[in-house]
Regions:
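A short beta-loop-alpha structural element at the N-terminal edge
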Residues: 2-16
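Conserved GNAT-fold acetyl-CoA-binding loop/helix
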Residues: 15, 22-42
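Conserved beta-hairpin
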Residues: 49-65
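Conserved acyl-donor/pantetheine-binding loop and adjacent beta-alpha core of acyl/acetyltransferases
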Residues: 66-100, 159-162
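Conserved catalytic-core motifs of GNAT/GCN5-like acyltransferases
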Residues: 72, 133, 146-167
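Conserved acetyl-CoA-binding loop-helix of GNAT-fold acetyltransferases
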Residues: 101, 107-120, 143, 147
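Conserved active-site alpha-helix within GNAT-family acetyltransferase domains
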Residues: 112, 124, 136-154
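Conserved GNAT acetyl-CoA-binding A-motif
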Residues: 115, 122-134
Length: 176
């Protein structure tokens, strides 16, 4: 499995992985992403900002994740406490967003590999933590995060979304 920065040539394959992720969430009764998120313009912006990574194997797209060291304003007002003092204006963390895997090639450890890659990237940038959030109903993601050593630190409500469920659970993993 190779994990690399996405390019615009990957757009259609990435969109297909996200469509598959939307379908997975819908099957589980989770309303996250059902409004079409992540939108094509978001995917393009993630690629242009060099923050979108793809996991591939022999030209098959296994998964995708947005990894950013730029901070996240949504994380500035959680109901809870981050373990590190970083804010969106002065981030000391790597943000992980929009993780999706291809169900047609499931059970290859793709999500675990993407999170491991995120940890390596955070260390390269000398960051102190990784932060991620997820829908309260996404029990698979909650279980994965806990298995990978993330701690549930609080919750917040998305400010700029059309999704029905705005509540998100926040997780953090400290790097030593």
């Amino acid at each position: 499995m190779e994990i690399r920065l996405a390019t615009m040539q990957d757009f259609d394959a990435i969109s297909a992985v996200y469509a598959d992720g939307r379908a997975q969430l819908a099957q589980l009764g989770i309303d996250q992403w059902q409004s079409g998120r992540p939108f094509p313009e978001t995917i393009r912006a993630d690629i242009q900002h060099q923050e979108l990574y793809v996991a591939t194997e022999q030209d098959i797209f296994l998964g995708v994740a947005m990894l950013s060291a730029q901070g996240d304003t949504e994380y500035d007002s959680i109901d809870g406490t981050w373990s590190t003092p970083g804010t969106s204006q002065n981030p000391d963390y790597l943000t992980i967003h929009r993780v999706a895997t291809n169900t047609h090639v499931a059970r290859r450890g793709t999500a675990t590999a993407l999170f491991g890659f995120a940890e390596s990237l955070a260390r390269q940038h000398h960051l102190r933590a990784l932060r991620v959030d997820t829908h309260p109903g996404n029990v698979r993601m909650h279980a994965l995060l806990e298995k990978l050593g993330y701690t549930h630190v609080g919750s917040f409500h998305l400010l700029h979304t059309t999704e029905p469920t705005k509540l998100r659970y926040a997780y953090e993993k400290l790097l030593s």
